[in-house]
Curated annotation (Swiss-Prot):
Active-site residues, as the UniProt record annotates them: E145
Assigned EC number: 3.5.1.88
SUPFAM superfamilies found in the cross-reference section: Peptide deformylase
The protein, known as: Peptide deformylase
Enzyme class, UniProt record, top EC level: hydrolase
NCBIfam families: pept_deformyl, PRK00150.1-3
Cofactor: how and how many bound: Binds 1 Fe(2+) ion.
Length: 179
């Protein structure tokens, strides 16, 4: 396993839609393991393949933050998952505002409104289709990482003014990291 370099915004790869995984082979399995290792090293909750420069529809999440009181039956708010070719099949009408951050937009966090619950289907490393009902931070992380796979940075959910300010700050931080 290895720690992969994380792509920092602004970068074209972060706003490019990732392609479907057509063959779940040893290279994909190694990528998933490397992504978990990279995410843990960076102290993140999730990481999309595009964030390590691989334009494939894969992400990993590990949410052990909380459990939700009065959680709907069958929904989970914690867990460690990798998802290949994920697709949200259901989103709740109920929404919640929480602060989000991103490994590709370091040193920033912003309040983002997202659906509270979701259902997602995805492939596992055995090419079997799985379905997960998620809530809380797990649902939020899945939505955030799926946005990455669709070429959408979480700051796109902000007003234009706040987005522009966030990108300007990201550019300054990226220049500092490159020096």
């Amino acid at each position: 396993m290895s720690i992969l370099p994380i792509v920092i915004a602004p970068d074209e790869r972060l706003i490019t839609r990732a392609s479907e995984v057509t063959d779940i082979n040893d290279k994909i399995k190694e990528l998933v393991n490397d992504m978990f290792e990279t995410m843990y090293d960076a102290e993140g909750l999730g990481l999309a393949a595009v964030q390590v420069g691989v334009l494939k529809r894969i992400f990993v999440v590990d949410v052990q933050l909380e459990t939700i009181e009065n959680e709907p039956a069958g929904y989970g708010s914690t867990g460690k998952f990798y998802m290949i070719n994920p697709e949200i099949t259901e989103l709740s009408d109920e929404q919640v505002i929480l602060k989000e951050g991103c490994l590709s937009i370091p040193e920033q966090s912003h309040e983002i409104k997202r659906p509270k619950y979701l259902t997602v289907k995805y492939k596992d490393l055995d090419n079997e289709e799985q379905t997960l009902k998620a809530s809380g931070w797990l649902a939020r992380c899945i939505q955030h990482e799926l946005d990455h796979l669709n070429g959408i940075l979480y700051i796109r959910h902000l007003s234009k003014l706040k987005y522009d300010m966030a990108i300007t700050k990201a550019q300054k931080i990226k220049k500092q990291h490159e020096q």
